[in-house]
Every structure is written in C-alpha cells, then in structure tokens.
Amino acid sequence: CNQSTLQMLLEIFVWIGYVSSGVNPLVYTLFNKTFRDAFGRYITCNYKATKSVKTVRKCSNKIYFRNPMTENSKFFMKHGMRNGINSTMYQSPVRL
C-alpha cells in the first residue's frame, strides 16, 4: 500500500470513531428502557430513593440505614480485617 492510501484509511477510521461516539447516546436512548427511565427522571428532576437502602429503625429524629457496603465495613472493623483478610491469617512477605 502506498502512503496516500494509508492516510486515507486512517482518516476514514477516525471519522467512523467520531460518528460511533456521536450515535452511541442515541442508541442507548432509543433501545434501553432503563436508560430512558433514568434519563427522563434526571431531566425532570424526579429523583427516587435507591432500592438498596433499607430503613432499619427510627429513634426520635434519627433514621438508621443499612446497606451491604456499610454492613461489610462494620464486620471487617469488628473482626480486625483489611480487604476481607484477617491479619492473623495473613503475614506480608515484606515483613521481617
């Protein structure tokens, strides 16, 4: 292949990338119902609470929430774990 053909192919592929990036949001909007619903709520400022947060109990003016991330963090802190690894089970090879 000569240099001008390679340059032309490079230009074509770059433009294909631009067009793909421009069309991608339209494709998501048209074909993905979850994306359409979320986008519609975002545009109209109609926010809903997430389903993963559960109300555990109410005491006076305080509301306590429970979700998997906070429960795991509490468990790891209670049992002296980092990243799910108990410090007595794992010794770093760097330590002397």
Swiss-Prot record:
Motif (NPxxY motif): 24-28
Cytoplasmic compartment residues: 31-96
Domain of life, per lineage: Eukaryota
Membrane topology annotation: Multi-pass membrane protein
Signal peptide: none
S-palmitoyl cysteine lipid attachment residues: 45
Comment, domains: Ligands are bound in a hydrophobic pocket formed by the transmembrane helices.
Subunit structure: Interacts (via C-terminus) with MPDZ.
Sequence similarity: Belongs to the G-protein coupled receptor 1 family.
The protein, known as: 5-hydroxytryptamine receptor 2B
Species of the source: Cavia porcellus (Guinea pig)
Source species taxonomy: Eukaryota, Metazoa, Chordata, Craniata, Vertebrata
Gene name of the record: HTR2B
